[in-house]
């Protein structure tokens, strides 16, 4: 396809159509200081010169910080073989064909991914993945709305505020009633949640561990939701599912997760992976694609797209999703990581992360004026309350090369002095001891 630039007349016509006086007006939201002053490109440079220029730009990013940030996105170790396997041309550049059975390797990879996450979550069905944890939770909510034909959802305030923003944005014009039930010191208010779920409720939406890191059992709440005809939706942390009570064991109808922790780099926020699993009774409401295994006429094993509710495959008005092929690569990375790590390795990863977090909580709890937000069990992160503003604490420690955690006051009123502190298996006791010393000195 040749590249033919637009004529001045065509550009003028497009600007008139959107009501812009000139091209610069299209970029008015970008501060002038950040806009390039000229688009005159220099002459070609050598590879060595380009590399030096890129390294100079890259040096502006700090990579020497010891980070205790979490909040849904975690710095776990990724096996070196992951990048090598993912970079194979058959996977890295392949596109999902519109005659999908022509690509048996891609379909088998999707099928194996679905099998792995179903086992991890203790659920019956999975799709090929969606964009991220937030969109997975939204899609789960819409599954519940379609299934129950109700327009009310009860959402715990302990669900990630980032996810709740996604829910509010996507449902803004869908006339859904999102009832957010306030937390109690970083814990789910079971009494209030139970009272909020009634005969008009499509879904109850919770998270485990919740955004504050606390671990709770939702079995009784899900039983109550079932009695009211509502769908139980839970958002999870995949790595910890090997040591916590699973969504399936709690009786969840739909379990979602942010799959970033399964081998995807943090990478400035993406691309990530939305994991979606559900009970078989809800599989027809599942968005995206679902790969299945069958036998051909000759009795040989073959893989097919059993369900494909994406708009590229069926009529738009019938589609439940427009999730595209890029997610298959992210799902493949999660599968590779799960296979390389194994169930035992994932359990060790989870146990070490929890052990480090408990050690950090013990060390910080010994600092005068510092206390935990609550006494509930937690996974690999916890909320600590300081006698001064948490943002101020974070700034002081960053100057010394430590990111101590996420200031909860950004999303929760009344918690301006609280930090969400996360540990993974990549931290050691020396890191945590240094964090405790710096915090004590800062206070």
UniProtKB/Swiss-Prot annotation:
Keywords: Oxidoreductase. One of its GO terms (biological process) is nucleoside metabolic process. One of its GO terms (molecular function) is glycine dehydrogenase (decarboxylating) activity. SUPFAM superfamilies: PLP-dependent transferases. CDD domains: GDC-P (cd00613). It catalyses: N(6)-[(R)-lipoyl]-L-lysyl-[glycine-cleavage complex H protein] + glycine + H(+) = N(6)-[(R)-S(8)-aminomethyldihydrolipoyl]-L-lysyl-[glycine-cleavage complex H protein] + CO2. It holds the Pfam family GDC-P. It comes from the Bacteria. Its EC number is 1.4.4.2. Belongs to the GcvP family. N-terminal subunit subfamily. The glycine cleavage system catalyzes the degradation of glycine. The P protein binds the alpha-amino group of glycine through its pyridoxal phosphate cofactor; CO(2) is released and the remaining methylamine moiety is then transferred to the lipoamide cofactor of the H protein. The glycine cleavage system is composed of four proteins: P, T, L and H. In this organism, the P 'protein' is a heterodimer of two subunits. HAMAP family: GcvPA. This is Probable glycine dehydrogenase (decarboxylating) subunit 1. The lineage of its organism: Bacteria, Pseudomonadati, Thermodesulfobacteriota, Desulfovibrionia, Desulfovibrionales.
